[in-house]
């Protein structure tokens, strides 16, 4: 009997009626060229006679064609598919004992932009793939931009930035077939056991969150906070969803990927349009330098977490998203986030991955958006009216600002060019790391203790069963059986029973323990 199952129909929401709403609130304007000349006809080109050739003097046609040919900019090499919204962050609690940043002063309200995304897929990929989610926050503070470029996972796949490009290549398309290749994914994992913690998180139920509103966000890295006494602590940032965690079952995720591939974008847009504003509460875990020196692991290792029992969450404030973008391209696609953008009082740690990101994010913006990407309104720190950008940076393609007017373009000068006026308030906190410059590998690092806690104590029986099922379903797609054996051998280090169940279901032998 033929399968007569009908596709699942979604209820129309505000996103479906956007054009109707626009029509209700706008009148028809005179069509013009890009340089403002009114156009009298837009359906036909100028030709020599009704059947003759085109004329290059038909500038409205030429202009439209040239602009159309250049509409696309390079998509993000990672986090290409995403959606976002604006809102406000309010610092609700006093943390002045650990941080001097004005954005975190109790009672301060700051405009924010949030962009959520998948990682590996292209800009047209589905929202319900098993993939980490980007959770990037831009705060327009009175001390400049603060970009907290986070994910929905508290850890990552690698701890060294030299491996980042290799990891991303393994998640994307085979360079010859241009197809997603499970052999690449699992070969990388089996060759890099440091990815174990993140792989367990990814293949758990939280690997496919139900939209963007029902997931946490984590700064993941360890950051430094400095107070007005020049005392510092190490912190981890946690944005916890106030909507509660919700995930999508694997079979439903597959259906949505085919029938409603943009469901997460629509869910966020529609919730805000209906005034059902999503919010997240910001917490920090705080550790002193003396405490982290006693850790059994590197506190600046991105594959590790801080125990919440030993370092409980301390509330900082709340982010509420209450404004949809007016134009996706100008405000979301052109948004540029960089972990290097931090206000005084928040600084980087020696985390190798964070240090690598401090360079790479700004570099990719220069490629994708151009030299003056910070002049694009959504990225402009002068969005906060208390900020005045004064630099010795000049010119470059698309310099559409004041270009510092007639101010001297060299430092130092005696002509009232910008000067350091309060060095004690803006100097970075001293860094006291020292050692031999070399490629220090962490081959002896413990890659399995924290994944073991995640498997044995964080997950319940149902969660463990789902984790095993999800891994088996993807791993069995590998056509290289050696990769399957190697991957199971790595995962068996997490838990003996976990390894045995995987080996049995995938029909491989576990290596003997000595």
Question: How should each PLM-predicted stretch be described?
Answer:
Residues 1-514:
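Active-site-adjacent core segments of small-molecule enzymes
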